[in-house]
Curated annotation (Swiss-Prot):
SMART domains: SH2. Gene3D superfamilies: SH2 domain. GO terms for cellular component: cytoplasm. It is found in: Cytoplasm. Interacts with SLAMF1 (phosphorylated). Interacts with CD244. Interacts with Src kinases HCK, LYN, FYN, FGR and LCK (via kinase domains). Pfam families: SH2. It comes from Mus musculus. This is SH2 domain-containing protein 1B2. Expressed in spleen. Expressed in macrophages, CD8(+) T-Cells and NK cells. Conflictingly found only in NK cells.
Amino acid sequence: MDLPYYHGCLTKRECEALLLKGGVDGNFLIRDSESVPGALCLCVSFKKLVYNYRIFREKNGYYRIETEPSTPKTIFPNLEELISKFKTPGQGMVVHLSNPIMRSGFCPGARRLNLEANVYENTDEEYVDVLP
């Protein structure tokens, strides 16, 4: 999966600089989480602040996002559908997503995202021990 607004291992500070440039509400990008291994962050600008929403990949390969507690939990088959939902106002984010910030050039983390797409298939939890 090669999303043009996925920036890989962009730091939180670098992310804030990109999103706040121009002062437009609804700028967004996806980056790797610095504090939760394997998680992604959907980062969006609103009123000169950057809000971060963690995205987790479920065992079945679907994606789940942390939003306001009052918002029903929804899972998505891919990141494109997740982003599409939150482009609509009133979906549980501080502001709807309106302007993707595209990465410029090579993104070292993009290949990692592709490799992790099927990690859930390689866990020990789904295997049965065979007795001799």
